[in-house]
């Protein structure tokens, strides 16, 4: 027989969420989630509800994204939304108008839309203390055109090693220098982007 739809318990919490806020939160964090059988809590988006803010977090222990949106609700709680229903929810939400109704308990979440109702099992466990790894009072601040930076990374990444996808970024003198190379095929790429930078010269490496 077809599986029964999970029922939320009497201690469930309910609220209304703005569609754009939920879609943006999923879009900006889902790419940073993991596929880790040993640490399943990282395989979803951590969502924290507070009276004046809604926080979305995604991490795979190598990269971390935290997205905050202002909101007004009376619920204080948190849960971990699995990646698959998050993607499904995002697709369905694009066809919605303003707000959706949501309810959740310690095991399941229910999203009620105009023509759909999505029920999913939440990931159980304690999410890592992500605030502990976010630097506070960082003296280095850079302001750069996002599209220009993204396009520069895409162009340079073509010449990175396909195994590591490593790109080197040097920031100094109001310039960002992007570099990548694949020694096996004797190819390399460099690109310089203008920026506004306040801080000491730094050099970092990351996966493209």
Label each region the model flagged.
Residues 1-208:
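Structural preference for solvent-exposed beta-strand-turn elements
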């Amino acid at each position: 027989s077809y599986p029964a739809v999970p029922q939320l318990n009497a201690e469930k919490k309910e609220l209304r969420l703005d569609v754009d806020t939920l879609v943006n939160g999923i879009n900006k964090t889902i790419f940073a989630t993991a596929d880790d059988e040993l640490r399943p809590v990282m395989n979803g988006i951590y969502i924290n509800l507070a009276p004046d803010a809604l926080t979305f977090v995604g991490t795979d222990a190598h990269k971390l994204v935290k997205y905050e949106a202002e909101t007004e609700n009376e619920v204080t709680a948190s849960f971990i939304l699995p990646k698959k229903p998050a993607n499904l929810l995002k697709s369905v939400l694009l066809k919605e108008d303003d707000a959706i109704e949501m309810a959740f308990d310690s095991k399941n979440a229910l999203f009620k839309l105009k023509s759909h109702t999505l029920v999913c099992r939440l990931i159980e466990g304690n999410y890592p203390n992500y605030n502990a790894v976010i630097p506070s009072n960082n003296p280095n601040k850079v302001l750069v055109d996002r599209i220009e930076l993204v396009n520069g990374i895409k162009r340079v990444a073509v010449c990175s090693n396909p195994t590591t996808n490593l790109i080197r970024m040097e920031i100094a003198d109001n310039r960002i220098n992007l570099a990548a190379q694949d020694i096996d095929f004797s190819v390399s790429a460099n690109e310089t982007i203008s920026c506004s930078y306040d801080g000491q010269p730094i050099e970092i490496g990351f996966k493209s």
